[in-house]
Amino acid sequence: MQRIQEKMLEALRCFLNGTKTDWQDGLSAGDWTALFKLSSQHQILPMIFEAVYSCPAFSSAPLELVQTLRGQAVRLVMVQGRKTMELLQLYPRLVQQGATPAVVKGLVCRSLYPFADHRTSGDEDILIPPEQFSTCHRVFVENGMAPLAPADDLDEAGEV
């Protein structure tokens, strides 16, 4: 497994540097599966796929796996792009209502990558002063959002 981890880190380094891997051989079908499973667990599958898809060694990967991975990578990038767009539309609405949200992690960290939407994230974290919870909650609901676990008291819940 250490070899697969090292390959993943090498591919990630290539992606971050705007290059592709140049692996000639040495990866079995099982290795490719393990590499992309690990990449998926770390939410970097699109980045790793982007870095390796054109290397000679990738031609040894099973065609079905390649097609599945290509589909997953494209889907993940598209979904992340949509999430980013939704945040960028929601943020000014919060500000218009007098809120002072601060985006932390998520979009801020993704902006450090060459292709931001290749770094997927499960959600966006927005720091909101407690006294603005009700305003933000209202804006979220008006824009089609709902809390996963509705709380009777937003202040007590500590999140909206």
Predicted regions and their residues:
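Residue-level "edge-of-site" marker
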Residues: 52, 107, 152-154
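Active-site nucleotide-donor binding segment shared across nucleotidyl transfer reactions
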Residues: 86-141, 149
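Helical scaffold of the NTase/Pol beta-like nucleotidyltransferase catalytic core
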Residues: 2-9, 16-105
